[in-house]
From Swiss-Prot:
Name by which UniProt lists this protein: Sulfate/thiosulfate import ATP-binding protein CysA
The gene coding this protein: cysA
EC number: 7.3.2.3
Catalytic activity: sulfate(out) + ATP + H2O = sulfate(in) + ADP + phosphate + H(+); thiosulfate(out) + ATP + H2O = thiosulfate(in) + ADP + phosphate + H(+)
Membrane topology: Peripheral membrane protein
Protein source organism: Salmonella typhi
Residues of the ABC transporter domain: 3-237
GO terms under cellular component: ATP-binding cassette (ABC) transporter complex
GO MF entries: ABC-type sulfate transporter activity; ABC-type thiosulfate transporter activity; ATP binding; ATP hydrolysis activity
Length: 364
């Protein structure tokens, strides 16, 4: 079941929370709405579900306009962050609930409901807990029950509002893998809200990054990481180093050092340079690729690589976070050399260098 979101606007009083949002979601795709608090992601999810109504614009499911349909008529499954299980019902009865309250003409027989719920219990690996009550379950088990309940009515669209937000880190990782496997098996169209970058990129086919009621970028997870469309996406998607400097002529100046850009930008003046830890060239020896001296102030071994915090020596004031491959862990106080690869230059929100990779090499 495809979803078409066409020019959706939403305001609460004088506060505009969604600004002309348009997005097409193909049938069978799993999409993450990713953004900080206040970005509009949960409001958009609730509008898709029919739990909120847009101020203007349209929602279409497989070409049919559902903008004015009540939530129960849209036939979507919805999973809340805090499970919303019925405390007085067993696991079995919670999952069966959506089937038992269907109109009589649509309601399966008791035998069919039992068969369906038993299948779902096996699918979510909770058959042995069918007779327990929610208070007797762990957080991860409760979320599986909530998901099974949403799937019981066989929705063609599944919506999830921060489904793993209330769980501890290890359980979140396990459920993310499980949800992805379930999606591969059942091929339902799914949209979920999260503020967790790792969760979005691990689970989703496509990540929609939102900020202040706007879509900043809608793309495959690896492209959101490697080719951020805006400065907001670049900074929001994870740890990034920022250096302030100045463009003069065809050179980038920081402190007493300058590097050739390989071109002369139309803009001249103060800029911010961004690059992720793994985009920094790092070596124990100085070279054309790694000419800048730094000193290790923190070293955190991560197995096949080490995450370092290094202090530039004489050429910049703030520490940088970098990644060094291999098992030979640098020691605190050790002197290394870095080069700034794949750097991006911005003046405010405006990117000022070509979109191909920029390498800041040997000091001029």
């Amino acid at each position: 079941m495809s979803i078409e979101i066409a020019r959706i606007k939403k305001s609460f009083g004088r506060t505009q929370v969604l600004n002309d949002i348009s997005l097409d979601i193909p049938s069978g795709q799993m999409v993450a709405l990713l953004g900080p608090s206040g970005s509009g992601k949960t409001t958009l999810l609730r509008i898709i579900a029919g739990l909120e109504h847009q101020s203007s614009g349209h929602i279409r499911f497989h070409g049919t306009d559902v903008s004015r349909l009540h939530a129960r008529e849209r036939k979507v499954g919805f999973v809340f962050q805090h499970y919303a299980l019925f405390r007085h019902m067993t696991v079995f009865d919670n999952i069966a609930f959506g089937l038992t309250v269907l109109p009589r003409r649509d309601r399966p027989t008791a035998a069919a409901i039992k068969t369906k719920v038993t299948q779902l219990l096996e699918m979510v690996q909770l058959a042995h807990l069918a007779d327990r009550f929610p208070a007797q379950l762990s957080g991860g088990q409760k979320q599986r029950v909530a998901l099974a309940r949403a799937l019981a009515v066989e929705p063609q669209i599944l919506l999830l509002d921060e489904p793993f937000g209330a769980l501890d880190a290890q359980v979140r990782k396990e459920l993310r893998r499980w949800l992805r496997q379930l999606h591969e098996e059942l091929k339902f169209t799914s949209v979920f809200v999260t503020h967790d970058q790792e969760e979005a990129t691990e689970v989703a086919d496509r990540v929609v990054v939102m900020s202040q009621g706007n879509i900043e970028q809608a793309d495959a997870p690896d492209r959101v990481w490697r080719e951020p469309a805006t400065r907001f996406v670049l900074e929001f998607m994870g740890e990034v180093n920022r250096l302030t400097g100045t463009v003069r002529g065809g050179q980038f100046h920081v402190g007493a050092h300058r590097w050739p850009l390989g071109y002369t930008p139309a803009y001249q003046g103060p800029v911010d340079l961004f690059l992720r830890p793994w985009e920094v060239d790092i070596s124990r020896r100085t070279s054309l690729d790694s000419p800048l001296p730094v000193q290790v102030i923190e070293a955190s071994p991560k197995g096949h690589y080490t995450q370092l915090v290094v202090q530039p020596l004489g050429w910049y004031h703030d520490p940088l976070t970098v990644v060094m491959a291999g098992d030979d862990v640098p020691q605190r106080g050790e002197r290394l050399f870095v080069g700034l690869q794949n750097a991006r230059l911005y003046h405010g929100d405006q990117r000022i260098e070509p979109h191909e990779a920029l390498a800041l090499a040997e000091s001029a």
